[in-house]
């Protein structure tokens, strides 16, 4: 059996003097990671341009349903780079399919020194789920740990039950995907054991590449 151990960076530590949460803060955006902000649409309205500029925002992920398009709009497309996603805040919505493109967009922003805001309508469920998934995959941690990390910075987050289930399933998916990337063609023909680094604990034995692929497809259609 081949052991493939994945290494992940450490999560940035909490600020020593974290600001006490107050109810009006739910209408503002909070910085979750250096350069990554989470908030509601009220933080991305036209009247907030000066706040965007003060915070150094360069990229925005705007999450909405088609029926919300009349009031949730990418207001600064001439000034910032946008990724607009059509996601319903519904437990049966397949949100996993949006995780890879969101991660690519966020990574592209942060790696070039930019700053990104992820927002939906309230900044509580859909956008929070994308941020949690990003932290899970980037730092190799479980859903509960990623949720706690985000909630310490934006207390009001509350992904719906279907999103929570998919986030819990996503750990196996991203670990399998990263492991396949690291493996040689010879290793792909052998049984393998996937281990996350010190920050994760998932250990999954798989027979071959086909089983990995099937696992990803089936998990992505749950919830």
From Swiss-Prot:
CDD domains per the UniProt record, alphabetical: DSP_STYX
Xref: InterPro entries: Dual-sp_phosphatase_cat-dom, Prot-tyrosine_phosphatase-like, STYX-Interacting_Phosphatase, Tyr_Pase_dom, TYR_PHOSPHATASE_DUAL_dom
Top-rank taxon: Eukaryota
GO cellular component: cytoplasm; nucleoplasm
Tyrosine-protein phosphatase domain: residues covered: 28-176
UniProt-listed Pfam families: DSPc (PF00782)
GO molecular function list: F-box domain binding
One of the GO BP terms on file: negative regulation of SCF-dependent proteasomal ubiquitin-dependent catabolic process
General function of this protein: Catalytically inactive phosphatase.
Family: Belongs to the protein-tyrosine phosphatase family. Non-receptor class subfamily.
Listed name of the protein: Serine/threonine/tyrosine-interacting protein A
Organism: Xenopus laevis (African clawed frog)
Recorded name of the encoding gene: styx-a
């Amino acid at each position: 059996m081949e052991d493939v151990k994945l290494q992940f960076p450490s999560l940035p530590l909490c600020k020593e003097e974290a600001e006490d949460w107050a109810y009006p803060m739910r209408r503002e955006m909070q910085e979750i990671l250096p350069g990554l902000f989470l908030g509601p649409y009220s933080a991305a309205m036209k009247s907030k341009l000066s706040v965007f500029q003060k915070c150094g925002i360069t990229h925005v992920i705007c999450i909405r349903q088609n029926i919300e398009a009349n009031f949730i709009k990418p207001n600064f497309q001439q000034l910032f780079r946008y990724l607009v996603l059509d996601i319903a805040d519904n437990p049966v919505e397949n949100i996993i399919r949006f995780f890879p493109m969101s991660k690519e967009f966020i990574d592209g922003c942060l790696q070039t020194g930019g700053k990104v805001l992820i927002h939906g309508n309230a900044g509580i469920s859909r956008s929070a789920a994308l941020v949690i998934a990003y932290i899970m995959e980037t730092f190799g941690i479980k859903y509960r740990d990623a949720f706690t990390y985000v909630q310490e910075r934006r207390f009001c987050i509350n992904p719906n039950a279907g999103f929570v289930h998919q986030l819990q399933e996503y750990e196996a998916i991203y670990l399998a995907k990263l492991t396949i990337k690291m493996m040689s063609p010879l290793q792909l023909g052998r049984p393998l054991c996937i281990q996350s680094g010190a920050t994760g604990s998932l250990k999954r034995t798989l027979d071959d590449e086909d089983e990995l692929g099937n696992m990803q497809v089936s998990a992505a259609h749950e919830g």
